[in-house]
């Protein structure tokens, strides 16, 4: 554009590509020429957008042809899982997890197929163009139109088990529409109520960091952050790049062979960072968390101004910029959730599907081992990159290279069908998008009967059997004796359910009932003993199975099964399958009579305290399971607020309570180091944890925020300490002060000030600023004024708010002194 050598970019330019182009142009040609380029891009884009007249019609919504096949495969898998559950091979918890994973896999694969279908058949499709342009729209919104809505979450973020298999073009049936209303309600509630929460978070962030300004060139801190240069994937490379670019190096590093300087002390790491990444070394950089100025940050600790790509200037309001950078995406994405309609999004492992029906082959002896997954299924776990080949015939074949830590579900030589999941790849760097919480599941018996647990037989380990039985209850009645009473022998006869045809039955089982008072006029029923009651051809209870003898000499029943033993489905012979899990109740010469039972597989460490005889729908046991909860930006903002406010939970959980963790860390470090070092080391770990947690929430929503912005807010939260021993100073025990101020004072005192680190939320840190004028403009105005008057405080007018209120020139930019 500005040189004789014209550069051609033969590719589609979406939002990311345009961003990279402008960034590259700014570095090479400067601000003025970049401004002219932006004007030309804007004019070019608007002219062509007007001429194109892009809009969506019903014909643009193209449903992928492979959807029908994917639905059939998912239904087959669900039927297999259901059979395993009914036969007691898997428990209820595993059944629910596998059911959800089946729909997740189908939803994800259908989304990929939808994009692939549009890409192959209609590149100029309006929907495809808008979706992949890089605008705020998301593929999860578009897939509802052309693939399937999938699993839905209610207004609390809880998962509903029944998925919506149709899309909006096909139309929803009455049940699917009813489920869909849950999500629609969630979207409306979030948009109307939660937007205010996102705005209030921004306000608190602004108040916490408004006085953070670039005040000096260098603070000469001895503290630094160590970064190890090591990456394997593109994602790790990208994270290293974001971490390093624009930072100041604090240690000269040379090559081992020729002492050539790779990077020198005080040098800012620019876009030539690739030469650093070629060496397996450790880089030491300055961060805002390491700055030891009592107010504000120095240029060396902050590094580049990300807007210009140059060292930040003195008087720059980096605190306000940081607060806006963190708060703005939350406000925007809160309003975006309305379009998602409550669909449950879950990051699953990447599945490898078979491209056609054929046979699979790979070497079992190399780069992996046979093992079992958490569902007790046989898999092959790869330790290194693994080659697998799928043959349709001698000519057509497909080759895949699986990364380490992948699961292969099929064995070599096994037949695979088109779109069947043959393997899953696992990325250790990815964090789960959905939060998990413990849920107690109640497992109830669907029949009445007798319980039995076989603890000796390993084959039936963890199986809980319920034998079919009916409860017989007798009604009690009484009457005062006024007349003569006749006593007769009364019994309740239980006839045999299974008897041979056309033969007299043996004596039936009789239960004698002892009745003290029976009315004289009660109804009488007579029955003869040994009378034929049941004929096989006439009545057959559905829960009973009878096996008749075959006209063969060979025995059908395996003799190892004795009366009372349990047998699973398909476990008698190969020719004659047992249709249901059963118990042998009668053994004859050539036949066995089986009774249908219902097996339940128990989880480990479940205590059995149930009665011997159980009624239908009686509680068998309770199992604790991990249940997923949809984690969109609404739930994300709640988590971000908890971290920034450093809230204490009512139930003290030391693994999650940051205040307790900080206290424990300080106690442990205090045994090895002095007071100042142990405080800074314990604070450093908490700072790292908060930074990683906040970044993970935003990155799950596709938002990139520079670590610098979050570090500035975290510095405000962790820069205070509480005094435990005042030493020679005029401070009072329990007073909260800045750690850098105390360290400067300790240099002059013989009896040092002893202190402990504390963690303040953004609201509290705003109330502990040096300026009392700033405090009264935020919260607790009367309290702050009275406290300032009693303590005879002086406001030195360092920040923005205090100068603004008094009508002074604010100390930033040209007003900075």
UniProtKB/Swiss-Prot annotation:
Catalytic activity reported: RNA(n) + a ribonucleoside 5'-triphosphate = RNA(n+1) + diphosphate
Residues holding Zn(2+): 219, 291, 298, 301
Keyword tags: DNA-directed RNA polymerase, Metal-binding, Nucleotidyltransferase, Plastid, Transcription, Transferase, Zinc
Entry GO terms, CC: DNA-directed RNA polymerase complex; mitochondrion; plastid
Domain of life of the native organism: Eukaryota
Cofactor: Zn(2+)
GO biological process per UniProt: DNA-templated transcription
GO molecular function: DNA binding; DNA-directed RNA polymerase activity; metal ion binding
InterPro entries listed in its UniProt record: DNA-dir_RpoC_beta_prime, RNA_pol_Rpb1_3_sf, RNA_pol_Rpb1_4, RNA_pol_Rpb1_5, Rpb1_funnel_sf
Localization: Plastid
Signal peptide range: none
PANTHER family in the cross-refs: DNA-DIRECTED RNA POLYMERASE (PTHR19376), DNA-DIRECTED RNA POLYMERASE SUBUNIT BETA (PTHR19376:SF54)
Function recorded in the entry: DNA-dependent RNA polymerase catalyzes the transcription of DNA into RNA using the four ribonucleoside triphosphates as substrates.
Subunit (UniProt): In plastids the minimal PEP RNA polymerase catalytic core is composed of four subunits: alpha, beta, beta', and beta''. When a (nuclear-encoded) sigma factor is associated with the core the holoenzyme is formed, which can initiate transcription.
UniProt protein name: DNA-directed RNA polymerase subunit beta''
